[in-house]
Amino acid sequence: MEWDNGTGQALGLPPTTCVYRENFKQLLLPPVYSAVLAAGLPLNICVITQICTSRRALTRTAVYTLNLALADLLYACSLPLLIYNYAQGDHWPFGDFACRLVRFLFYANLHGSILFLTCISFQRYLGICHPLAPWHKRGGRRAAWLVCVAVWLAVTTQCLPTAIFAATGIQRNRTVCYDLSPPALATHYMPYGMALTVIGFLLPFAALLACYCLLACRLCRQDGPAEPVAQERRGKAARMAVVVAAAFAISFLPFHITKTAYLAVRSTPGVPCTVLEAFAAAYKGTRPFASANSVLDPILFYFTQKKFRRRPHELLQKLTAKWQRQGR
């Protein structure tokens, strides 16, 4: 990333002499984003289709999963623009509005996924640790939909400043789309970026870990022989805990650690350009991990939902039988 000095001077801020060499983005991001698009688009469409065709058996967890898949699908639809941008050497020809929209969709998907995974985890905790309590069963699916509306409103409110800070600029006689903000606004973006990390990641992550720690304690206390149904339920809860924790660790933790470090360094006066470039490379190098949640989420869905895992096999068997009959 390089800062056009004219941008800083137009804003009344001192110019910078740092020039980032980020050729690695042209090599790393297009193939990674292409893989995420190729896998995430059909997988999330399949999840949405399967849940929508099972509306009578729609549970609260399925409602949260449906909204999670919608968030992933919206992000996947924005990837072609980013693939073209980085394949052309970080050249953005799509205009300022598209730049702001793409950056907003990335962070909306990121923090929407975090919140919906937290909702799924909390629902699993209630189902295992308080299965007979009437207070968490009131409202049924309607309550789950209200929670989803609240999540979307919260995500939009949290991420809307991203669309305000993101902008296009001129570097080396080409138009670029800034990710966080133009470097001239680094100190202005810093408080918002840190608040977004705390509210949009750390607090939900802490809530999710608390849910699964309590759930693990409950499962460990259930000693002695159990019925097959109970054993299957415990196994499902354990699988969910491991997979969700892994999804968080792979997708979200490296990205937020490097992003926080980069925000702190680039907002500190007098930091050498080589240090700034190193932190920028570390942050942007973990961006594919954050994008991978669009693929990990539907895999998580199929891994933990046995009845939905059976459907693709049943459909494949029906198609195979149909082709065999036609071939006779």
Curated annotation (Swiss-Prot):
Keyword check for Cell membrane: yes
Listed GO CC annotations: plasma membrane
CDD domains recorded: 7tmA_P2Y6
Membrane-spanning residues: 28-48, 63-83, 102-122, 145-165, 195-215, 237-257, 281-303
Subcellular localization, as worded in the UniProt entry: Cell membrane
Residues exposed to the Cytoplasmic side: 49-62, 123-144, 216-236, 304-328
InterPro entries in alphabetical order: GPCR_Rhodpsn, GPCR_Rhodpsn_7TM, P2Y6_rcpt
Residues that carry a glycan: N5
Name of the protein described by the UniProt record: P2Y purinoceptor 6
Disulfide bonds: C99-C177
This protein's record includes keyword Cell membrane: yes
Major localisation: membrane
Membrane topology, as annotated: Multi-pass membrane protein
GO biological process, one term: positive regulation of vascular associated smooth muscle cell proliferation
Membrane topology, Extracellular segments: 1-27, 84-101, 166-194, 258-280
Function, in words: Receptor for extracellular UDP > UTP > ATP. The activity of this receptor is mediated by G proteins which activate a phosphatidylinositol-calcium second messenger system.
Molecular function, one GO term: G protein-coupled ADP receptor activity
Xref: Pfam families: 7tm_1
